[in-house]
Design a protein with these regions (language model features):
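Active-site rim loops that border cofactor/substrate pockets in soluble metabolic enzymes
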Residues: 46-70
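Glycine-rich, charge-decorated loop segments at or immediately adjacent to ligand/cofactor-binding or catalytic sites
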Residues: 45-47, 118-131
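Mid-chain, well-packed structural core segment of small domains
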Residues: 68-100
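Short internal beta-strands
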Residues: 32-44
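C-terminal binding/interaction regions
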Residues: 87, 102-105, 111
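Conserved small/polar residues in nucleotide/adenosyl-binding loops
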Residues: 145-151
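Glycine-rich phosphate/diphosphate-binding loop of Rossmann-like nucleotide-binding domains
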Residues: 12-20
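General beta-strand structural signal in soluble alpha/beta enzymes
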Residues: 35-37, 59-61, 85, 113-117
């Protein structure tokens, strides 16, 4: 399988879910580069080490301190292949604008994003990751970047 760069982000009330998901999928994740927001990454790394799994995990800042924005910038630069973002939909987040920015950039730049464990499981088990004949279709909105704007 080709080596992917996978972003893992989880709100405080979903961090336990993320750690459980990462441990459940540790074998898969150990073959890929993982980029996380700070606290999530440290928790995932510790849990994997306790299970004896070596993983390539890079931690950005904590989400409220700009980690979501750092990962969104990586999406724009085409450095992220897949994002798993376990969102706490039951409580307001002080950095809601950053959260929406990350979700929006994934949609705009055609990066698959899973917002629950089931969709994350479906995405990581997709055979399309290794299908060299499959080329994701760019969203039609991307064509707007090629428009010639009128000049004065």
């Amino acid at each position: 399988m080709k080596k992917l760069t996978i972003a893992l982000v989880a709100h405080d009330n979903r961090k336990a879910d993320m750690v459980e998901w990462a441990i459940h999928n540790a074998e898969f994740l150990s073959h890929h580069h993982i980029v996380c927001t700070g606290t999530t990454g440290n928790l995932v790394r510790k849990a994997m080490e306790e299970k004896g799994v070596t993983a390539d995990i890079a931690c950005m800042h904590s989400g409220p301190l700009g980690g979501d924005a750092e990962i969104a910038a990586m999406v724009v630069r085409k450095e992220i292949d897949l994002a798993v973002f376990l969102i706490d939909d039951l409580n307001p987040q002080p950095h809601e604008a950053d959260i929406q920015m990350l979700l929006r950039q994934c949609r705009v730049h055609n990066v698959p994003i899973a917002c629950n464990r089931y969709s994350a499981d479906l995405m990581i088990t997709s055979t399309l990751w290794d299908d060299e004949s499959y080329v994701p279709t760019e969203p039609k909105s991307v064509s707007y970047t090629h428009l010639t704007l009128p000049t004065k």
